[in-house]
């Protein structure tokens, strides 16, 4: 039924055979999306856009991405995931073309806001549409593994391999041409996923009574106060990656202009940071099952990120452009971001009768982090500087450490009984940290 690579190995790896090409397409798409993540900010500043305007541009992009992340599941129910993915690919390609052919050459900031901001709708529709597709196709017994491979491809591309591609292309073809290469990668990945995946029964996610599109959309907001623990979990998810998206704005500038690293060195640090994160995602999933989800989130996520965020600033600040030391703290920061992985299982378990709404609320938190981080930078980097922004992010992580203690489950072990309940299988479909 599908045009896919050999199935035996794929099946053993836990990848649904009919969707195998989709994983490859997702990886290429996210590599293309991640190419700019380590250098677009300094590139625009070099072209005369102020630092605060760049931060605002990234904030608008994040708002669009957050909206698309929230809507992707509902639209997949209405249209089917394939159509949602086509929509995401088309949005990304059209507005990237506008950004490259008009906004950048004309140095028009309003046009940048329109083209780059609306392009932010693209990748969540494509990626999370595919995530819903996986949830509808993968056998329940292997759903967690299938979702693990999804996040491996997602974070492997954005920003890990994307930054490596940029570090290799920029010295050879320049920064502007590298943005065109990103478009080519996104187009190639999108077409591979959408043309080579020929699955006939994964178009729509099954819905239970009361879980229609409108009910899920409205309920994903009202559940935040109907069940305050879900609201707390969503807030913790916002904090989880807020610093990551804020650092995309200020850290390339800080590490290259203040600390003294070259742009290539910074891109290598960024790649190492999120390469560590990829494997730490798998590790903390296991740790959460052993230690308990809430404790893992609080100590490895909240407390860990509080420390690693400060180290990421102060170690290079004191040691200067010492690449091995910077590599260590960058890897430590990337690993601690993954300490929030058990949120994926915990939050839907807090609302067992409306897991779809809890998942949408968690995705809302994930999407919100993409603009909260740049917004913190835009508001505070002027009056407080980079150091002040770092302390704000560290303080947010300390707050998440405290909030995590309110995410109490009836079964604090949170593993054996939850794993035995078939209803919790859908928890794997939520966005990991």
Regions found by a protein language model. Name each.
Residues 2-16, 199-234, 433:
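Juxtamembrane intracellular "pre-TM" segments in multi-pass secondary transporters
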Residues 39-52, 249-265:
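Short amphipathic helix-loop junctions that connect adjacent transmembrane helices
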Residues 62-70, 159-160, 274-278, 282, ...:
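Residue-level signature of mid-helix packing/kink "hotspots" within the transmembrane helices
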Residues 68-80, 170, 281-293, 381:
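Helix-to-loop junctions at the C-terminal end of transmembrane segments
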Residues 78-89, 290-303:
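Cytoplasmic membrane-interface "Motif A"-like loop-to-helix N-cap segments
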Residues 90-106, 303-319:
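C-terminal ends and interior cores of transmembrane alpha-helices
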Residues 115-153:
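Cytoplasmic helix-loop-helix junction between adjacent transmembrane helices
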Residues 147-163, 365-373:
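Glycine-rich segments within core transmembrane alpha-helices of 12-TM secondary carriers
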């Amino acid at each position: 039924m599908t045009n896919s690579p050999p199935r035996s190995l794929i099946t053993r790896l836990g990848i649904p055979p009919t969707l195998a090409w989709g994983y490859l397409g997702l990886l290429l798409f996210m590599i293309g999306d991640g190419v700019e993540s380590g250098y677009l900010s300094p590139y625009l500043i070099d072209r005369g856009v102020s630092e605060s305007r760049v931060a605002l541009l990234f904030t608008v992009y994040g708002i669009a991405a957050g909206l698309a992340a929230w809507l992707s599941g509902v639209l997949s129910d209405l249209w089917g995931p394939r159509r949602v993915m086509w929509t995401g690919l088309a949005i990304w390609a059209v507005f990237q073309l506008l950004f490259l052919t008009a906004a950048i050459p004309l140095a028009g900031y309003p046009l940048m806001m329109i083209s780059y901001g609306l392009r932010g709708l693209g990748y969540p529709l494509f990626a999370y549409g595919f995530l819903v597709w996986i949830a509808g196709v993968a056998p329940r017994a292997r759903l967690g593994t299938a979702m693990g491979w999804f996040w491996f491809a997602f974070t492997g591309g954005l920003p890990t391999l994307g930054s490596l591609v940029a570090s290799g292309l920029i010295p050879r073809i320049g920064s502007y041409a590298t943005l065109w290469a990103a478009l080519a990668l996104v187009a190639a990945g999108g077409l591979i996923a959408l043309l080579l995946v020929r699955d006939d029964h994964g178009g729509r996610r099954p819905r239970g009574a009361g879980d229609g599109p409108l009910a899920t959309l409205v309920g994903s907001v009202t559940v935040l106060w109907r069940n305050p623990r879900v609201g707390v979990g969503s807030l913790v998810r916002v904090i989880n990656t807020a610093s990551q998206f804020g650092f995309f704005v200020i850290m390339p500038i800080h590490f290259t202009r203040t600390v003294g690293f070259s742009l290539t060195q910074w891109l290598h640090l960024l790649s190492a940071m999120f390469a560590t994160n990829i494997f730490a995602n798998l590790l903390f999933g296991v740790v959460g099952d052993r230690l308990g989800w809430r404790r893992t989130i609080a100590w490895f996520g909240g407390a860990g990120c509080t420390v690693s965020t400060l180290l990421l600033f102060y170690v290079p600040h004191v040691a200067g452009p010492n690449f091995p030391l910077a590599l260590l703290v960058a890897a430590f920061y990337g690993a601690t971001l993954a300490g929030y992985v058990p949120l994926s299982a915990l939050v839907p378990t807090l609302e067992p009768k409306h897991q779809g709404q809890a998942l949408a609320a968690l995705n809302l938190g994930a999407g919100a982090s993409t603009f909260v981080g740049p917004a913190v930078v835009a508001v505070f980097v002027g009056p407080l500087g980079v150091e002040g922004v770092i302390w704000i992010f560290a303080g947010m992580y300390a707050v998440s450490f405290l909030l995590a203690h309110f995410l109490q489950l009836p079964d604090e072990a949170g593993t054996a009984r939850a794993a035995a309940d078939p209803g919790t299988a859908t928890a794997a479909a939520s966005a990991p940290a």
